[in-house]
Amino acid sequence: KMGLLSEKNKEVLLGPLSVNNPVIVQMLGICSALAVTSKLEPAIVMGISVTAVVAFANVIISLLRNTIPNRIRIIVQLVVVAALVTIVSEVLKAFAYDVNKQLSVFVGLIITNCILMGRLEAFALGNGPWESFLDGIGNGLGYALILVIVGFFRELLGSGTLLGFQVIPQAFYDFGYVNNGLMILPPMALIVIAVIIWVHRSRNKELQEN
């Protein structure tokens, strides 16, 4: 019997953080990366929210996998995800109202995130609850990692702040430094992601296409 963190389970958990990242390798979930990464805080909150939804949706679908009729499995998956997204939305309204307002409709649109349905279809329907939970955590954190990196650079270079705190010294501005207003525009998220993809593929030869 495999241990809770066997080599296979470690690969399931850690693979999405690097060589099988859902955003920069599988090209999933990019749309929300445009919308919520102009600042670091909403990027972190969205990353945590998606991680929670993917992990628990994976577990629920895995537990039900032998009882769900094949012809309605997509509907069941959507209902499970919608219920979890509703819970996450209410929690954010209760404990992080300002960030929830910044995220706006994009919390509700978690249900349309390709990563969610992709993991439910590709993994949870064919694996046990623990493996599915690890897969959800891994893919959620892989997604969150990219959002945080993009949000970090967009807020730092676009506003001179991180988490709302000024980090670029006033002396820089006195000498003529100007924030790059382009960084807070949605197209710059694509460009930052493209740079991350380039760096990632340069470091991982197995991802390079001939």
Question: What is the role of each PLM region?
Answer:
Residues 1-14, 204-210:
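Intrinsically disordered, low-complexity non-transmembrane regions of multi-pass membrane transporters
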Residues 15, 62-66, 131-139:
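Short amphipathic alpha-helical coupling elements at transmembrane boundaries
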Residues 30-34, 50-55, 82-89, 111-115, ...:
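Hydrophobic core segments of alpha-helical transmembrane domains in multi-pass membrane transport
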Residues 40-56, 76, 100-111:
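Structural signature of hydrophobic alpha-helical transmembrane segments
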Residues 57-70, 117-127, 201:
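C-terminal ends of transmembrane helices
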Residues 68-81, 102-108, 135:
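Cytoplasmic-side transmembrane-helix entry/capping segments in multi-pass membrane proteins
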Residues 87-102:
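Transmembrane alpha-helix boundary signature
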Residues 133-210:
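C-terminal transmembrane helix-loop-helix hairpin of multi-pass membrane proteins
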